[in-house]
């Protein structure tokens, strides 16, 4: 069975596609994922705590300077550019085929590629808010701030990135929005995620159709439920297909 050809036909024939993606979408933009052998959780660093600990709400509260040291070094990739997957998805949205992108990533590369309807389950590095007065700050304010801990230029409060840390709940509006898109989609393409991070991985259970596509370099717990499984680079697969279709 030519899975790539089948995916091409699905994309060609559908105008109600939803994409759900994880860290593997951005690894081709040289942003490391979390759980692979080269991922953030496996590689050695100069920090005294594990990434899981440092990316927790309690660590942010108790060791705010250490949090920002880690965050600025390991979570922000200001020179990263959208890759073939990001551009392909933006084109599919532009021609009216893709209705929403649901992402676990915080890098903002989908928007940089031109995608409009992006649901960021774990937040985004481009949004930062004063914890006291709620003033908005962009990423440059964090990067260019001379202090390790960025402070609000109005009230002096700590400026916290709008990313979901461990021990923090996901935004229920985003979850409900994502569920609605998944439930109503004709084709659900899941890419670059091992589907082991909950509650985000639960989204797949809301899909009611019979055109589930999984594109990931390694197998996932949901492979047997999918109509199409492709263990390959999501950028080369989606990028190639979208180019062939002339979108």
UniProtKB/Swiss-Prot annotation:
Pfam families: SIR2. GO terms for molecular function: histone deacetylase activity, NAD-dependent; NAD+ binding; zinc ion binding. Nicotinamide binds at residues 34, 106-107. Binds 1 zinc ion per subunit. NAD(+) binds at residues 23, 27, 34-35, 104, 106-107, 122, 193-194, 216, 234. One of its GO terms (cellular component) is cytoplasm. Keywords: Cytoplasm, Metal-binding, NAD, Transferase, Zinc. Its EC number is 2.3.1.286. It comes from the Bacteria. It is found in: Cytoplasm. Signal peptide: none annotated. NAD-dependent protein deacetylase which modulates the activities of several enzymes which are inactive in their acetylated form. This is NAD-dependent protein deacetylase. It comes from Clostridium tetani (strain Massachusetts / E88).
